[in-house]
Amino acid sequence: LLVANRGLYEYEILEEQENAIAVTLLRCVAEMGDWGYFPTPKAQQLGTFCLEFEVVPYAAGETGTAFEEGYAFQQDLTVAQAGLERAFLRKPGQVKPELIEGKLPLEMSFLAFEGNGIHMTAFKKGQKKDDLFVRFVNHMEQGEILSFKKEDWMKEVYRSNVIEEKDDVLTPDADGIYHVSLREFEIATFGVVR
């Protein structure tokens, strides 16, 4: 069972209550801690609140799908399609948009990736250089394969770390796909030269 919510990411598994999941939805307290009196007057949030959470039951072996659903719940919907199965899309260099029917083509995506239980957590420009940095996390209890397509704008992709240091350069396969093994619960950062 997975519980996804928006806002406060605080929970506890209550083993003495058959592994019930206790989720903090709103915290508005007059004082903090059980180690003395520490007043927090600005934490008194008077008023009406709208709280959102989602309960996602899933079968054994579907942990990755459950995590995808949980993360999707926390994101606002981004729409690029008009109507149910049609979109007007202006490709680079086109003056007039063309009508696309069916799904939007992958060649117009900025970065497409796949991986069971793997979620993108960051996509940003570097602090000290012009490279882009993308970070993924593997939520699974076993290793998984992250796959992503080499786009035309990518000159080089390399492993990095959180302080943006360059490590091993990756090589795509013959179809232009990068395949990277991620260990269980691994957080992996990649630099992209453009």
Where are the model-predicted features located?
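Terminal accessory/anchoring regions of large secretory-pathway or extracellular enzymes
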Residues: 1-194
